[in-house]
Curated annotation (Swiss-Prot):
It comes from the Eukaryota. Transmembrane segments: none annotated. GO terms for cellular component: ERMES complex; SAM complex. The gene is MDM10. Keywords: Membrane, Mitochondrion, Mitochondrion outer membrane, Transmembrane, Transmembrane beta strand. HAMAP family: Mdm10 (MF_03102). Component of the ERMES/MDM complex, which serves as a molecular tether to connect the endoplasmic reticulum and mitochondria. Components of this complex are involved in the control of mitochondrial shape and protein biogenesis and may function in phospholipid exchange. MDM10 is involved in the late assembly steps of the general translocase of the mitochondrial outer membrane (TOM complex). Functions in the TOM40-specific route of the assembly of outer membrane beta-barrel proteins, including the association of TOM40 with the receptor TOM22 and small TOM proteins. Disulfide bonds: none annotated. Component of the ER-mitochondria encounter structure (ERMES) or MDM complex, composed of MMM1, MDM10, MDM12 and MDM34. Associates with the mitochondrial outer membrane sorting assembly machinery SAM(core) complex. This is Mitochondrial distribution and morphology protein 10. The keyword Mitochondrion applies. The lineage of its organism: Eukaryota, Fungi, Dikarya, Ascomycota, Saccharomycotina. Belongs to the MDM10 family. InterPro entries: Mdm10 (IPR027539).
């Protein structure tokens, strides 16, 4: 479960960038597990300012104070308190990349955003400034400061587009410079209608880095394919990532198996060391059984009526008329099939968006790490709760006999509570 300030920033930013190219697999496999007790209290003091204070206990008491200001208007329609928030908005879950998801999404325009956070008792500071010059270009400045002379400043110049994304990065840490890009290969809409195939597209992204102080380069590229099932309308995503310098190859398959579940499998392989790993992850959503949304009825498919002899009504030849009637019947069935596929996709995503979920279970495991990660996110009486653990496998020797026993013990265990007004 993401924090409140990240939820506010996420509502203002686009996820059409290289960083979110493999978001679906990361959300199902590498989700964050709390390792201590943490309580976070947030509120919206003015229409443009947000405040957060949190306290955590991990052997010692730690905490932080966060402040955010933005000149965005109309955030009341997007930012909800913990009692009215949609749990799908604050949980890192399967990311729908296809175009039909933007059913009820609203765009909020803003020119600047200021974010600051101070940790205590160590007094670490972190901040961020986002300044938009145009609708598609912005500059992001992030910095981290502490008393042990650890001061890092990183600047980003980002340019967004419907199909393209470009980003230049400069950091004071080893004078690191980087360039990241993303291009979406979207098929042109059909002249007849928007069909299933217009919701399938390929995304290609890459990143190039160079540490000027040590002259250490690195690069990576990622390919993503998104589509829907023709019969059920459920989305699925395939990614392939490759780092040529380290020889790391990673492939993922993520699918929304139903409106209440998602599954992901990832296979990693190194070309140089021949090491491999297989990771599995899934999430199970629970719907509120007391509150049923009446408006979740499936929309009726729109049938396109093609009149007989549509292409030629002036032919006097009986044989030619029979051929034209066969052509009309063929095109009519194709149009109905196109509309049926589109209706199935739109109905699935509309039904998913309108469902009232109360909690979600997440599970992930890895053959190489031999662990089991469990996370539960949910709502209870206006509070947002997140509890999880990571079980790892260890071998212990039995004193009575020399046989080794396999045991599992929790390497991480924690509980996080959030409340916002």
């Amino acid at each position: 479960m993401i924090e409140y300030m990240n939820y506010v920033i996420k509502s203002l930013q686009s996820n059409n960038d290289y960083e979110h190219l493999t978001l679906s697999s990361r959300s199902l496999l590498n989700f964050k597990i709390p390792n201590a007790f943490k309580f976070q209290l947030s509120n919206k003091s003015t229409p443009y300012t947000y405040n957060t204070i949190d306290i955590s206990t991990n052997k010692v008491i730690n905490g932080s104070i966060t402040y955010l200001y933005t000149d965005a208007k109309g955030l009341d329609k997007l930012i909800k308190d913990s009692h009215n928030i949609n749990i799908q908005s604050i949980v890192e879950t399967y990311n729908h990349h296809c175009k039909t998801l933007n059913i009820n999404k609203q765009n909020v325009d803003f020119k600047s955003l200021y974010y600051g956070r101070m940790y205590y008792p160590n007094s670490h500071l972190e901040g961020m400034i986002i300044k938009k010059f145009t609708t598609n270009t912005q500059v992001v400045l992030k910095w981290v400061s502490s008393f042990n002379s650890c001061n890092i400043i990183t600047g980003y110049f980002q340019k967004y587009g419907k199909r393209n994304f470009q980003e230049l990065i400069v950091s004071s840490n080893d004078f690191l410079c980087g360039y990241r890009f993303l291009h979406n290969f979207i098929e042109q809409p059909s002249k007849l209608n928007n069909s299933l195939y217009n919701n399938s597209y390929i995304s290609l992204g890459g990143e190039f880095w160079l540490a000027i102080s040590t002259l250490s380069p690195t690069c990576a590229t990622t390919l993503r394919y998104c589509t829907h099932s023709a019969t059920t309308g459920r989305p699925l995503t395939l990614t392939l990532s490759f780092n040529p310098l380290f020889g790391h190859l990673s492939s993922t398959y993520s699918a929304k198996t139903s409106s209440n579940s998602a599954f992901c499998v990832q296979y990693d392989f190194n070309l140089y060391s021949i090491d491999s790993n297989l990771s599995l992850g899934c999430e199970l959503w629970k719907q509120n059984e007391l509150i049923q949304n009446v408006s979740q009825e499936k929309s009726k498919k729109q049938e396109i009526q093609v009149p007989p002899n549509f292409y030629n009504n002036n032919s006097n030849d009986a044989k030619q008329k029979r051929i034209l009637n066969d052509l009309n019947t063929t095109f009519e069935s194709s149009l109905k099939k196109i509309d049926k596929e589109r209706a199935v996709i739109e109905n699935f995503e509309t039904d998913l968006y309108n469902k009232d979920f109360t909690s979600v279970w997440k599970f992930s495991t890895s053959l190489r790490d031999k662990n089991l990660c469990i996370l539960w996110d949910g709502k209870f009486k206006g509070f947002l709760l997140s509890a999880g653990t990571e079980l790892i496998r260890i071998n212990t020797n039995n004193e009575n006999n020399s046989q080794s026993l396999v045991k599992f013990y929790p390497a991480k265990l924690g509980l996080q509570l959030q409340f916002s007004t």
